[in-house]
Swiss-Prot record:
Annotated localization: Secreted
Keywords: Neuropeptide, Secreted
Species, as recorded: Karoophasma botterkloofense (Gladiator)
Cellular component, GO annotation: extracellular region
Primary role: FMRFamides and FMRFamide-like peptides are neuropeptides.
The protein's name: Extended FMRFamide-12
Gene Ontology biological-process entries: neuropeptide signaling pathway
Primary location class: secreted
Similarity comment text for this entry: Belongs to the FARP (FMRF amide related peptide) family.
């Protein structure tokens, strides 16, 4: 899961 630490996917995994 590259989206876990990807700042570009901020609206995806970050709470």
């Amino acid at each position: 899961s590259p989206a876990l630490d990807d700042e570009r996917n901020d609206n995806f995994i970050r709470l």
